[in-house]
A protein has these predicted regions:
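Surface-exposed molecular-recognition determinants
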Residues: 2-217
Length: 217
């Protein structure tokens, strides 16, 4: 037989206010801060850039064996007129450590504009290009992107970062784009763990940016 606990308030011993209270309809009010990581998405990192930096690096402190999939959002603006957003991956043959960026042409990418026939792709590159067209540096010009980092702990297929972005050309026009970037040479890097990602502009510096990283359960 099931037991039933009937209460209308829960208070921790020694406190002078309730932590949880219930009304006559069964609605719950939390009067104290709720913490923990039971949500499907767990925020791991939030970074605000307010002065020039050359790159944003998320290392093995955040991208490690804890999660298979990660969600990244990034918005920003650059110093150069006519830049693109690129990335590289830190990979490791072992689960521990921060990994290294592979030398040689072991990155691949593809971008496709939603507004015209513009595409760009390569499966033998030293970096991944995430934005299709060049981005301006006038007031209001910049980019916003989001993507899923997939397969961080798989050892049968290389890690990939895929998502969507919107940018503003050097003339202020908007472009929406799909992108995929990741490790290639699957015979080698399919067995490697991803232990970080480096985000940067192919010219100039990152002047302002907001970066968020979530682990996906």
């Amino acid at each position: 037989m099931a037991s039933i606990l009937k209460v209308d308030k829960i208070r921790v011993t020694g406190l002078d206010s309730d932590s949880i209270s219930f009304d006559n309809s069964g609605n719950i009010t939390f009067n104290k801060t709720v913490t923990g990581d039971n949500a499907a998405m767990v925020k791991l990192l939030e970074t605000d850039v307010t002065s020039s930096v050359s790159e944003l690096v998320i290392n093995g402190t955040y991208i490690n064996e804890t999660y298979e999939t990660y969600f990244i959002s990034l918005s920003g603006a650059g110093s150069a007129d006519g830049y693109r957003v690129h990335c590289q991956f830190y990979t490791s043959a072992t689960q521990s450590g921060n990994g290294t960026i592979a030398s040689g042409s072991n990155h691949g990418h593809g971008t496709h504009s939603m507004q015209d026939t513009g595409t760009h792709n390569s499966d033998t590159d030293t970096e991944c290009r995430l934005t299709n067209s060049t981005i301006g540096n006038s007031t209001g010009e910049g980019y916003l992107l989001w993507g899923y980092l997939l397969g961080a702990n798989r050892t049968d297929v290389p890690v990939q970062f895929m998502g969507q972005q919107t940018t503003f050309y050097t003339n202020g026009s908007q472009e929406a784009c799909n992108f995929v970037g990741g490790m290639v040479t699957p015979g080698t890097y399919g067995a490697y763990y991803c232990r970080g990602i480096r985000l940067y502009h192919n010219s100039g510096t990152i002047e302002t940016a907001k970066l968020k990283l979530y682990g996906i359960k």
